[in-house]
Amino acid sequence: SQIRHYKWEVEYMFWAPNCNENIVMGINGQFPGPTIRANAGDSVVVELTNKLHTEGVVIHWHGILQRGTPWADGTASISQCAINPGETFFYNFTVDNPGTFFYHGHLGMQRSAGLYGSLIVDPPQGKKEPFHYDGEINLLLSDWWHQSIHKQEVGLSSKPIRWIGEPQTILLNGRGQFDCSIAAKYDSNLEPCKLKGSESCAPYIFHVSPKKTYRIRIASTTALAALNFAIGNHQLLVVEADGNYVQPFYTSDIDIYSGESYSVLITTDQNPSENYWVSVGTRARHPNTPPGLTLLNYLPNSVSKLPTSPPPQTPAWDDFDRSKNFTYRITAAMGSPKPPVKFNRRIFLLNTQNVINGYVKWAINDVSLALPPTPYLGAMKYNLLHAFDQNPPPEVFPEDYDIDTPPTNEKTRIGNGVYQFKIGEVVDVILQNANMMKENLSETHPWHLHGHDFWVLGYGDGKFSAEEESSLNLKNPPLRNTVVIFPYGWTAIRFVADNPGVWAFHCHIEPHLHMGMGVVFAEGVEKVGRIPTKALACGGTAKSLINNPKNP
């Protein structure tokens, strides 16, 4: 194994991701940020300097478990203090498992501003993947707004709320087109793009040779959009999800929610004199964003040769049965670790939209999360009892709660309590969706857990009840770090609390997290080793450091 050392500077820069100039948060002058590539077992050291003039910054390494380095998870107020302007912070962690991962900002809505990039982990030197391919294409999906994240944050925190609306553009590797379409020739209402190919918004072309197999790695770091990926005339063989191998299956398209990643294999066995569309459309919300497009270019064809037929049609946004059918097909590959048969503790988390003092919030069991100024990891390690609410949040919601009608209760409050687990405890979480403020409306939410992979034991419609127990899959449930709950439905997951630290578990939709849609899990914090001083140089832990510089 080796050490991969990166020196990064984060700063705002002018950029035109969708042919309209805007400001993006870039790294070393790049957008998206540089790709990290390592082998399982390697150490990754990122020397991160904050060149933003007036904002702190952190970077979360999404899907990396951070065993032994919970301070390097990159979640502001949970694992570390934000890095102040002008300061440098050293992230140092091991990448344990091969897979398709990514990194992104985790302070305010900085992910939305463009602070993200890919993190690819190959098998350890000398080991091979369990499937063969001739070449590889890496695709990072995101969504883009013309409105700045500052304006979005202020709007979400205002009364009445000003919602951010749907994104202007879907970006493929940071590239999209807003005022024009590369598929205009099939639709006279669309303005054709006049692109030479060198522009920052020119599509990222997938170049392939005929009669070969390619692995396409697809990760979604969208702020809001649930996406659907398809390639004209080509079947996709799904082989990996969130860095874990799955039982391979063929599909014409995949749904991908924010925080998820997949690998699919394609075989370039179509007519070699043609090129084919790659289309990424929006699902699960009423779309107001054109699909993101690029070409699968069969070499030696010219890139200017457009496919004979229009791009594949994205499935209807509200065809939830189709989404469920795809999601339910994902199971663990043969030989994957199986979940413990019994749980020690089961927590029910009810997802509701509520109004608190006229502000629209998201809440879990009637608590809307507002992070404290002292990072939990330091507060818990050094027993700072005043740093956050010592009363744990509720583990159940009222049995008679009606998930089919808008919430009527006025009990919702802002809070920052923590769910605490014993080391080795087997924890079940039942995520329960419900109606929003508006009649007959429930949304899809992707939930992401830091510091762990979990087994997805099952999904269902309506309210979870004891009868569902027998339907849970203990035989071959997939291991994931992100899982979706469908409208008016529930999702059951199981994980082992075996990674000392404090870990966020939250909706991966950026505005929803901003509005309080998350919880905090802690386990075995007393077993956490030395935490770099700089990670805790704020809030209550800073005072301890000043008073006792040797060891807070």
Swiss-Prot record:
Positions of the Plastocyanin-like domain: 1-122, 134-300, 344-523
| Binding site residues for Cu cation 4 | 445, 507, 512, 517
Residues the record lists as binding Cu cation 2: 62, 104, 508
Its main localization is secreted
| Listed SUPFAM superfamilies | Cupredoxins (SSF49503)
Entry EC number(s) = 1.10.3.3
Query: Which domain of life does the protein's organism represent?
Result: Eukaryota
Q: What NCBIfam families does the record point to? A: ascorbase
Q: Name it.
A: L-ascorbate oxidase
Per the UniProt record, the source organism is Cucurbita pepo var. melopepo (Zucchini)
